[in-house]
A protein has these predicted regions:
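Conserved catalytic core of the tyrosine transesterase superfamily
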Residues: 1-162
Length: 162
């Protein structure tokens, strides 16, 4: 299979004109795929869709960033498409392969000192300043996103509940 990998990398470099860094990354991804197949006592050309999905999940579990996993999945899809075109495989197990969804990054938050500085900004002697300070207070007190705050309607607010 290393001949097929070398041929694919040559194709990426010479025909598709991919950057050297991309080709190196794809070589690393295909090396990881080969290692994964070997650990499961299979040849790369014998992997099926379930194997490839498990491979992508393994990359996530190993701490690769979602972007790196997405690149590896794109590499694997392209590689199997290449193998199919070269008649090295009868079917493309990666045809509909998608990268697993990552947990969304946790939002960053302001420390107490930054909140105090933010609350001190609006000029509360002006109606707009009062409005802005109220909006900032609601954001801080409730943890709403800005889009959620902007979507609030007067009927959504229960002033008696506090």
């Amino acid at each position: 299979m290393s001949q097929a990998i070398d041929a694919y990398l040559d194709y990426l470099r010479d025909v598709r004109r991919m950057s050297p860094n991309t080709v190196v990354s794809y070589a690393r991804d295909l090396g990881a795929l080969t290692e994964y197949a070997s650990k499961h006592h299979k040849r790369v050309e014998a992997l099926d869709r379930r194997d490839l999905e498990a491979f992508a999940r393994r990359l996530m579990a190993n701490g690769l960033s979602p972007r790196s996993v997405a690149r590896a999945v794109a590499c694997v899809r392209g590689f199997y498409r290449f193998l199919l075109g070269e008649k090295k495989v009868a079917a493309d197990p990666a045809e509909d392969l998608r990268a697993p969804r990552a947990w969304p990054a946790l939002p960053t938050y302001l420390d107490l000192e930054a909140v105090d500085r933010l609350l001190a900004q609006p000029d509360v002697s002006e109606p707009r300043g009062l409005r802005d300070k109220a909006l900032i207070e609601v954001l801080y007190a409730t943890g709403l996103r800005v889009s959620e705050l902007l979507a609030l309607k007067p009927g959504d607010i229960n002033l008696e509940a506090g």
